[in-house]
């Protein structure tokens, strides 16, 4: 499948945004409790898609796998921009 030169729209509903945020928080705490660097592990998972970056501890691996990685990235970007004073629509 080839790429198109036209802009494609991607939309995530508000309920999913909230659930992704809660899931990332829970996964962060699980990673921290197990002695991992949570940021590095989450980035590793998001970039590679390899669930081995997230432990099974507290069901963290299954929780994060409920969402597509692009949905996780969208929520992270939204949160970052809002935290820097940008009115994200």
Curated annotation (Swiss-Prot):
InterPro entries: IreB. This is UPF0297 protein SPy_2114/M5005_Spy1797. HAMAP family: UPF0297 (MF_01507). NCBIfam families: PRK05473.1 (NF003997). Pfam families: IreB (PF06135). It comes from the Bacteria. Belongs to the UPF0297 family.
